[in-house]
Structures are given as structure tokens and as C-alpha cells.
């Protein structure tokens, strides 16, 4: 009996082992790796704000309206064609945020080649309020002078783009080789030596998006409240959080 029980138990053990062997889970074929998905690059907030916000449009229109209102006082009794307003081009009259957006999407930096290609597209849109302001200047008997640090080779494309956004400039002064400082060009406008046939002008206002767009100004004045006394009177600045001479300032 004992031997029978042992044999029976041994038989059960064998059956259990055999049965268990049939339940072994074999490893499944490894799944192929999921294809990588290119995640769209986020547009930096400063570019998004410039391109999409209501606040930006309110600020540019507000600035140009203030400048137009001041003209009535500054030019009262002044002979027509004897005075002028000097404006910067980029981010003052011409909106190049599409160029900045493309650079962000491509994760690429500014280059002269990419910038030249963009300018030659001649598709920059107008800064809100700019065209209406320049038309107001002409209606009051003034002249519009654009002083820009675009290269001389880009001047024709710049003039064409200005006309496309309904800005009729009486004079466009691009950057002569080696002269990034705008002050000499400002002086030539005043002296009547800026271009043949362009008479000396009493410059009554300057408008720009960079502190360097204003006579004798630089980032060094930022801690001197007295240096800003002409802003809102004859100098009018537009917001540009995308780029500018401010980028060269080191945090304290």
C-alpha cells in the first residue's frame, strides 16, 4: 500500500510537471520602437506677443497718435517742406516678425544671407499706425525720412516694401559701409547734404524702436532720468522685445 501511494504521488508529480511545462509563457516578439515624432518648436513669447497681442497694437497706435498730436504744436507757423520727421524702418515702420518666427521654427540665428533673402521678398507688413502717421506728416506739409541700418544693397527692396505698405518716404538713408551710428546721417538731413535735391530740414520728431534711433542716445543713459526728457515731446519709442541694443546689457 505504501509503495502504491508513493507511486501514485510520484505519478501526480510527473503529471504536474508536464502540465506545468505546457503553461510556460514564451517571450513575445519585441514590439518595434515607435517612430520618432518631430515636436513643433515653440515660438518664443516675445515673438508671439509682438505678432498676436492686442496690447502691442494698442501701443503702436497710441505712440503714433501721440506723435501726430504733437506735430500740430511743433509745426505751427513753420513753412511747409522746411521740416521733417525721421523714422527708423525695422519694427518702427516695417514689421519683420515673420522673419523672427521663421528663425525660431528653424532654430537658427540671424545671418546676413537669411536677412537679405527676407528683405528681398519685400513682404514685411506695416506696423499698426505707421502709414497713417506718415500720411498725416505729408498732409501737414512735412517730409518723411527713413534712416535705417539696412545695407545699401537692400535699399531698393526697402523702398519697394515701404511703398507696398503705403508709406511714401521722401528720402531713405540706408547704412553706408562702416557707419552703423545714425547720428552723422541725422546731421546730413539737417544740413541738406543727405542726398542731391533734398534741402536742409528742421527735424521736429524722431520715431524708433531702439534707443540708438535717437540723437546722441545709447543704453548708457538708462539710469539717468533726465536723459529721457524729450520722450513724448519730440522722441517717440515703440516696443520691441524681440531684439535690440538692450541685448548687449549684462545683468548686474
Report the location of each language-model feature:
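C-terminal cap/substrate-recognition subdomain and adjoining C-terminal extension
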Residues: 54, 142, 151, 155-252
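Active-site neighborhood of HAD-like aspartate-dependent phosphohydrolases
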Residues: 75-82, 93-125, 139
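Acidic helix-start/capping segments at beta-turn-to-alpha-helix junctions
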Residues: 83-93, 152-154
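Bacterial N-terminal signal peptides that target proteins for export
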Residues: 2-12
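Solvent-exposed, polar/charged alpha-helical surfaces in well-ordered, non-transmembrane soluble domains
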Residues: 65, 69, 128, 132-135, ...
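Non-catalytic pre-domain segments flanking phosphatase-related domains
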Residues: 23-87, 249-252
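Short, acidic loop-to-helix structural element flanking the phosphoryl-transfer center
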Residues: 116-145, 152-153
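Bacterial N-terminal signal peptides
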Residues: 11-21
Amino acid at each position: 500500500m505504501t509503495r502504491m501511494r508513493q507511486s501514485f504521488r510520484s505519478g501526480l508529480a510527473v503529471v504536474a510537471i508536464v502540465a506545468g511545462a505546457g503553461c510556460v509563457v514564451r517571450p513575445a516578439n519585441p514590439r518595434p520602437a515607435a517612430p520618432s515624432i518631430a515636436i513643433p518648436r515653440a515660438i518664443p513669447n516675445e515673438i508671439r506677443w509682438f505678432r498676436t497681442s492686442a496690447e502691442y497694437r494698442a501701443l503702436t497706435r497710441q505712440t503714433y497718435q501721440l506723435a501726430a498730436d504733437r506735430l500740430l504744436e511743433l509745426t505751427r507757423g513753420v513753412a511747409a517742406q522746411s521740416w521733417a520727421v525721421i523714422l527708423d524702418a525695422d519694427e518702427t515702420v516695417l514689421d519683420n516678425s515673420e522673419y523672427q518666427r521663421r528663425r525660431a521654427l528653424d532654430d537658427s540665428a540671424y545671418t546676413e544671407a537669411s536677412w537679405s533673402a527676407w528683405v528681398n521678398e519685400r513682404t514685411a507688413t506695416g506696423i499698426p499706425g505707421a502709414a497713417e502717421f506718415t500720411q498725416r506728416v505729408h498732409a501737414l506739409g512735412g517730409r518723411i525720412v527713413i534712416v535705417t541700418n539696412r545695407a545699401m544693397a537692400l535699399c531698393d527692396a526697402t523702398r519697394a516694401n515701404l511703398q507696398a505698405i503705403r508709406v511714401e518716404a521722401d528720402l531713405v538713408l540706408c547704412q553706408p559701409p562702416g557707419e552703423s551710428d545714425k547720428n552723422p546721417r541725422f546731421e546730413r538731413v539737417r544740413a541738406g547734404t543727405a542726398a542731391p535735391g533734398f534741402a536742409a530740414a528742421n527735424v521736429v520728431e524722431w520715431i524708433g524702436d531702439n534707443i540708438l534711433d535717437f540723437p546722441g542716445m545709447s543704453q548708457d543713459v538708462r539710469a539717468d532720468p533726465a536723459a529721457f526728457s524729450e520722450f513724448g515731446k519730440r522722441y517717440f519709442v515703440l516696443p520691441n522685445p524681440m531684439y535690440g541694443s538692450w541685448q548687449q546689457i549684462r545683468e548686474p
